[in-house]
UniProtKB/Swiss-Prot annotation:
Forms a cylinder of 14 subunits composed of two heptameric rings stacked back-to-back. Interacts with the co-chaperonin GroES. Residues 523-547 are annotated as: Disordered. Belongs to the chaperonin (HSP60) family. Together with its co-chaperonin GroES, plays an essential role in assisting protein folding. The GroEL-GroES system forms a nano-cage that allows encapsulation of the non-native substrate proteins and provides a physical environment optimized to promote and accelerate protein folding. Pfam families: Cpn60_TCP1. Its EC number is 5.6.1.7. It is found in: Cytoplasm. This is Chaperonin GroEL. The lineage of its organism: Bacteria, Bacillati, Bacillota, Clostridia, Halanaerobiales. InterPro entries: Chaperonin_Cpn60_CS, Cpn60/GroEL, Cpn60/GroEL/TCP-1, GroEL-like_apical_dom_sf, GROEL-like_equatorial_sf, TCP-1-like_intermed_sf. One of its GO terms (molecular function) is unfolded protein binding. PROSITE patterns: CHAPERONINS_CPN60 (PS00296). It is an enzyme of class 5 (isomerase). GO terms for biological process: protein refolding.
Length: 547
């Protein structure tokens, strides 16, 4: 396909128009008095959101050149969201500010490659300063504040997330699901839970709740299919003599083996529950190993040269309690060695850091949570489907932001930290266009505070100058229209969010500034592609002549 090209100033101006289109759509949502954006859906109700990345993802421009600029800034929002879970609007605003300020200097003759170097050095210095300004998150109250702000000043959501994090710990899994009721609630599952239930309803111990509860049971863990009772008979006899119940986790238990276990349960001779092993393939082996480490048992597998017939009672795991329902099995207080469990957790953490696949990362995170803490489910309820989607989205954002805060600490919110970090740039002794690059960043750092004030109906430039003249940590509370100590007032941002927004914005803006040529597909002109080579009626006329 033929290509069209644009060069130098033309190219950069086209990119600027694209950046502005996307950034202006996202900008309206910034701050406590920011507005919402309504996104049309191909089917169903439209989505109403104030989440920067959701808006950015919907934007695709008709003009190829402008679209390149818009897509580059969209990536800034997406990357910030992936890393920190929030701060997407701030990142977009910073990218636009750095790019526009940089364009003026490039047009005035500055070398974009040297400017880029100056911008990078400025950002490096600012990241160090943000680290210095951050304060660790301590206590449930602080966690609750961060979550509430990220969820659009919703204190109820803040409390729920703080409670969930307190119960399952930093490594626990907190998932957000839709509730069938109007209210929003929290369910916590302690211990290790996996999604496999009993193989026969005759195994239940509580017929009302249809669940089996085993107190202080032995746990047999194997990746084999058990169909012949003779394979496990010696083991069953030893467990029966101990008077303890037994949980069997195997690839499957079927035929004669299952029938024998059920008959013994009904007669009251021996209490045993069988469940299928969780997961599939290599993931199943890893999960069985997790269960073995948690309960202090061994996986009886032929990979290790172990056979069921030769298994000893010392190879079985133990737990304080096991509850099995039709769908789930929960192991509470496994008897595994805490040192072994910690080593396993470290190993899974390393795998999480090294994996490139989002799916694998999610599954590893689940395994980590099951070993380290537990699982909490926030069930979101609302009056209408549109409100439900919006609320669920807000809670997911708040959850990511809260995790980021626990990880790297908190800084003053409302763009205040970016202005507080400006004096640190004076320590950089650079010259020429590198110094200009630093000045570009210095000016761009004012953009978030200016915009928050503008969106709340105040004069942005006046507010920026006032924040600059105040002590560090004093910022503008746009909701109440007053200058306050941001951290004491609970207006805070996770340091990771502020850092990621700045790094991603500067990276994209600097790349756009160094652009000298744009190449895009040439738009097809429908008129020129018509029947130019074959005038209308030419062929029938010719045919008539031949006849």
């Amino acid at each position: 396909m033929a290509k069209e090209l644009k060069f130098s100033e033309d190219a950069r101006r086209a990119l600027e128009r694209g950046v502005d289109t996307l950034a202006n759509a996202v900008k309206v949502t910034l701050g406590p008095k920011g507005r919402n954006v309504v996104l049309e859906k191909s089917f169903g109700a439209p989505t109403i959101t104030n989440d920067g990345v959701s808006i950015a993802r919907e934007i695709e421009l008709e003009n190829h050149y402008e679209n390149m600029g818009a897509q580059t800034v969209k990536e800034v929002a997406t990357k910030t969201n992936d890393v920190a879970g929030d701060g997407t609007t701030t990142a977009t605003v910073l990218a636009q500010a750095i790019f526009k300020e940089g364009l003026k200097n490039v047009a005035a003759g500055a070398n974009p490659m040297i400017l880029k170097r100056g911008i990078e050095k400025a950002v490096q210095k600012l990241v160090e300063e943000i680290k210095e300004l951050s304060k660790p998150v301590e206590g449930k109250e602080a966690v609750s504040q961060v979550a509430a702000i990220s969820a659009g000043n919703d204190e109820e959501v803040g409390k729920l997330i703080a409670e969930a994090m307190e119960k399952v710990g930093q490594d626990g899994v907190i998932s957000v699901e839709e509730s069938k009721s109007m209210g929003t609630s929290l369910d916590v599952v302690e211990g290790m839970q996996f999604d496999r239930g009993y193989l026969s309803p005759y195994m239940v111990t509580d017929t009302d709740a249809m669940e089996a509860s085993l107190e202080d049971p032995y746990i047999l863990i194997t990746d084999k299919k058990i169909s012949n009772i003779q394979e496990i008979l010696p083991l069953l006899e030893k467990v029966a003599q101990s008077g303890k119940p037994l949980l069997i986790i195997a690839e499957d238990v079927e035929g004669e083996a299952l029938a024998t276990l059920v008959v013994n349960k009904i007669r009251g001779t021996f209490n045993c529950v069988a469940v299928k092993a969780p997961g599939f393939g290599d993931r199943r082996k890893a999960m069985l190993e997790d269960i073995a480490i948690l309960t202090g048992g061994q996986v009886i597998t032929e990979d290790l040269g172990l056979k069921l017939e030769n298994a000893d009672i010392s190879m079985l795991g133990r737990a304080h309690k096991v509850t099995v329902t039709k769908e789930d099995t929960t192991i509470v207080e496994g008897a595994g060695d805490s040192k072994e469990i910690q080593n396993r957790i470290k190993q899974i953490r390393t795998q999480i850091e090294n994996t490139d696949s989002d799916f694998d990362r999610e599954k590893l995170q689940e395994r980590l949570a099951k070993l380290a803490g537990g699982v909490a489910v926030i069930k979101v309820g609302a009056a209408t489907e549109t409100e439900l989607k919006e609320k669920k989205h807000r809670i997911e954002d708040a959850l990511s932001a809260t995790r980021a805060a626990v990880e790297e600490g908190l800084v003053a919110g409302g763009g205040t930290t970016l202005i507080d970090a400006i004096p640190a740039l004076d320590e950089l002794n650079l010259e020429g266009d590198e110094a200009t690059g630093v000045d570009i960043v210095r000016k761009a750092l004012e953009a978030p505070v200016r915009l928050i004030a503008d969106n709340a109906g105040y004069e942005g430039s006046v507010i920026v100058e006032k924040v600059k003249s105040e002590d560090k940590g004093i910022g503008f509370d746009a909701y109440n229209g007053e200058f306050v100590n941001m951290i004491e007032s609970g207006i805070v941002d996770p340091a990771k969010v502020t850092r990621s927004a700045l790094q991603n914005a500067a990276s994209a803006a600097a790349m756009l500034l160094t652009t000298e040529c744009l190449v895009a597909d040439k738009e097809e002109d429908n008129d020129s592609n018509g029947n130019a080579g074959m005038p209308g009626g030419g062929m029938p006329g010719g045919m008539g002549g031949m006849m």
